[in-house]
């Protein structure tokens, strides 16, 4: 697994990097293949924004969340990307099964 974390207008502390890495590793454990994540943390005047992009076979998933608290934004983002990956996996399995049945 490869995780690239960058910050815009924020100094990335070891605690934030560790927190993001730990959350994304949990996502990787759920799925069978190697995943690469690109994470951008950004601080605006009133809110914190977190973006993650990952590449799956046949699809790129991009998720963006804004919140007042950085750690809450990370938690919300991980929940969102988890739902999108599960949806992708379910559709991928349905397509695989329908292809086998039609043969």
Question: Which residues does each PLM region occupy?
Answer:
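N-terminal, polar/charged subdomain of small-to-medium soluble alpha/beta proteins
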Residues: 1-103
């Amino acid at each position: 697994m490869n995780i690239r974390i960058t910050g815009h207008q924020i100094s990335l502390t070891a605690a934030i990097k560790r927190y993001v890495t730990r959350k994304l590793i949990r996502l990787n454990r759920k799925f069978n293949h190697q995943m690469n994540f690109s994470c951008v943390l950004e601080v605006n005047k009133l809110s914190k924004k977190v973006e993650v992009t990952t590449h799956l076979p046949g699809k790129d998933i991009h998720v963006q969340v804004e919140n007042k608290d950085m750690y809450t934004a990370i938690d919300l983002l991980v929940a969102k990307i988890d739902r999108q990956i599960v949806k992708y996996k379910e559709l991928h399995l349905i397509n695989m099964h329908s292809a086998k049945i039609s043969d």
